[in-house]
Amino acid sequence: MPCYAYQGIVPVVDPTSYVHPLASLIGDVIVGPGCFIAPGASLRGDFGRIMVEGDSSIQDNVSVHANQLRDTVIRRGATIAHGSIIHGCEIGENSLIGMNAVILDNAVIGPENLVAALSLVKSDTHTPERSLVVGNPAEVVKTFDPHQVTWRNNGGGEYQKLARAALTDLIEAEPLTQADEDRQAQRVASEAIAVRLSGATAQERERKAAATNTI
């Protein structure tokens, strides 16, 4: 992975986390256990510290930057979806930041929040636990019941499994000139279901979450 010391401070990555070779870590960056850092992600700890707690997922082309006044903290089990910008703020435990969302300086996203795709969370915004945060500028539009938080990560989520698998199974290779006949059979089955707020997929996620919580 591209990893750069800055002013003598070297990034730290737990050996159980996977950082893709096309991601970059600069300076005061600390990545906890079981995390997945995807291609194109940039974590720049040149102005301040970036702390990524365990079981978090930083997806493709995410930019994470700290400012001089506070650390940027991504709490345990958080998911930062493709193309998002996380700048000088705190993302709560088990929160999901949707694709291309922007979280600005000194904002604090509460635990188990869902920030909708393309939302802009202004500086100094604080959101309560289990909030749905939507818009530009973003506002809290509802509060989820506990069983509706179907994106919660407890070490067994899809991206936590991917982090473990990628450490041994993700290998650079030359492309084939044609597809293998048994290509589909080689793929490991996944139970991942996209996060939706309504419709059949939302109902299925809630059903599975409710069943898990009653065990």
Task: Describe these PLM feature segments.
Residues 38, 59:
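Small cofactor-carrier domains centered on a conserved lysine used for covalent cofactor attachment
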Residues 1-8, 12, 46, 54, ...:
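Glycine-rich hexapeptide-repeat left-handed beta-helix
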Residues 16-18, 37, 76, 97:
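Short Cys/His-rich Zn2+-coordinating modules
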Residues 1-34, 42, 192-215:
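Extended, small-residue-rich solenoid/repeat segments and analogous flexible loops
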